[in-house]
Structure formats: structure tokens, C-alpha cells
């Protein structure tokens, strides 16, 4: 691969990162719009809270450590978010009868509406993504998959130890 091609790939990668940041800012606004159309009155004020609701909805019963692990968040951050979600009545906390130390979370009816709306939006985006992938051949899809797997491994390694590594092969 030529240096020019590598530079073009890198430039597009950086552009993709910037677009992803911008998209994150518009996702909440889109969620608010969809919620209004579905007559969902109360909504958490940030996407992380919505994603915590989604995580709880997908994995009930789940505790603080489970949410932190699945979402790659600190336990302290999950505690802060879950406390707010309990106060806003999107989730409830409870203890299992055989384990009084662990606190688990489940969705309230209000939280379930947020979860269902979030799932609906994700399904719509997933379908659009699959349709986009259909424009590539099987071989091209395999190359994209390999690239994304290796890039993800590299980024996860950097996040774990804080040092940029060479891409994992």
C-alpha cells in the first residue's frame, strides 16, 4: 500500500472520529424528537443515562459492577448515574433474597418506555447500516471486518494501558 493511500485512510479515519463526536451531540436531540412523537414526556438529559437504562433493560437483573463492565464506565460514574435515575423514577434498586449485600437494578414503567424507544431507534439504525453494507461485496465486507476488529483491539489496548501500540495483527 502506498504512503498516499495510507495518508488518505488516516485522514478519513480522523474525519470519521470528528463526525462521530458531532453525531453524539445530535443523537440526544433526535431522541428527544422521537420521544415527543411517541408521547414520552420525561427523558434523561444525556445519552449515557439513556444507555444505562438500555443496559439495565437488556441485562436485568444487573448490579453496578455489571453495568460498569458492560458499558466500560467507572463504578463511581455508574453510581452517580443510577442514583439520579432512581430519583427520576426511571429505575428501581433492590436486593436479591439470597444476597443482601448486592444492589441490583430494574426498569420502572417509565424506564421501560425509554428502553423501548431506544431499542426502536437502534433497530432502525441497524437496518440502515445493513443496507449500507449490502453495497459491498463479501470480500470487501471481510476486509472491513478485519480492519475494524484490529482497530478496535488497538484502541482497547491503548485505553487499558494508556500507550499507543502498533495495530494488533
From Swiss-Prot:
The record's GO molecular-function terms, alphabetically, read:
DNA binding; DNA-binding transcription factor activity
Q: Which domain of life is it from?
A: Bacteria
Q: Which residues form a coiled coil?
A: none
Q: What SUPFAM superfamilies does the database record attribute to this sequence?
A: Winged helix' DNA-binding domain
Any idea which residues the entry calls the DNA-binding region? 64-87
* Inducing or repressing factors: Up-regulated in response to iron starvation. Negatively autoregulated. Also repressed by CcpA in stationary growth phase.
Q: Show the Pfam families listed in the entry.
A: MarR
UniProtKB keywords: Activator, DNA-binding, Repressor, Transcription, Transcription regulation
Q: Which InterPro entries match?
A: HTH_MarR-typ, Metal_resp_HTH_trans_reg, Tscrpt_reg_MarR-type_CS, WH-like_DNA-bd_sf, WH_DNA-bd_sf
Q: Summarize what gene deletion causes.
A: Deletion of the gene induces changes of proteins involved in cellular processes depending on iron availability. In iron-rich medium, mutants overproduce a red pigment after entry into the stationary growth phase.
- Enumerate the spans annotated as HTH marR-type domain: 10-153
Q: Tell me which Gene Ontology terms the entry assigns under biological process.
A: negative regulation of DNA-templated transcription; positive regulation of DNA-templated transcription
Q: Which PANTHER family match?
A: HTH-TYPE TRANSCRIPTIONAL REGULATOR PCHR
Tell me, in a sentence or two, what this protein's role is.
Represses the expression of the yvmC-cypX operon, which is involved in pulcherriminic acid biosynthesis. Also negatively regulates yvmA, yvnB and its own expression. Positively regulates yisI expression. Acts by binding specifically to a 14-bp palindromic motif, the YvmB box, which is present in the promoter region of the target genes.
| Assembly description | Homodimer.
This protein is called: HTH-type transcriptional regulator PchR
> What is the native source organism of this protein?
Bacillus subtilis (strain 168)
- Gene that encodes it: pchR
Amino acid at each position: 500500500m502506498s504512503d498516499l493511500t495510507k495518508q488518505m485512510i488516516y485522514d478519513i479515519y480522523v474525519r470519521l472520529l470528528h463526525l462521530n463526536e458531532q453525531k453524539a451531540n445530535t443523537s440526544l436531540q433526535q431522541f428527544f424528537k422521537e420521544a415527543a412523537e411517541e408521547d414520552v414526556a420525561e427523558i434523561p438529559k444525556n445519552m449515557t443515562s439513556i444507555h444505562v437504562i438500555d443496559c439495565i433493560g437488556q441485562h436485568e437483573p444487573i448490579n453496578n459492577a455489571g453495568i460498569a463492565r458492560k458499558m466500560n464506565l467507572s463504578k463511581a460514574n455508574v453510581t452517580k448515574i443510577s442514583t439520579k435515575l432512581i430519583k427520576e423514577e426511571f429505575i428501581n434498586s433492590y436486593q436479591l433474597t439470597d444476597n443482601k449485600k448486592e444492589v441490583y437494578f430494574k426498569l420502572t414503567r417509565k424506564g421501560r418506555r425509554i428502553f423501548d424507544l431506544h431499542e426502536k431507534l437502534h433497530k432502525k439504525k441497524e437496518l440502515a447500516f445493513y443496507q449500507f453494507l449490502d453495497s459491498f461485496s463479501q470480500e470487501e465486507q471481510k476486509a472491513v471486518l478485519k480492519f475494524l476488529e484490529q482497530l478496535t483491539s488497538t484502541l482497547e489496548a491503548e485505553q487499558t494501558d494508556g500507550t499507543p501500540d502498533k495495530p494488533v495483527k
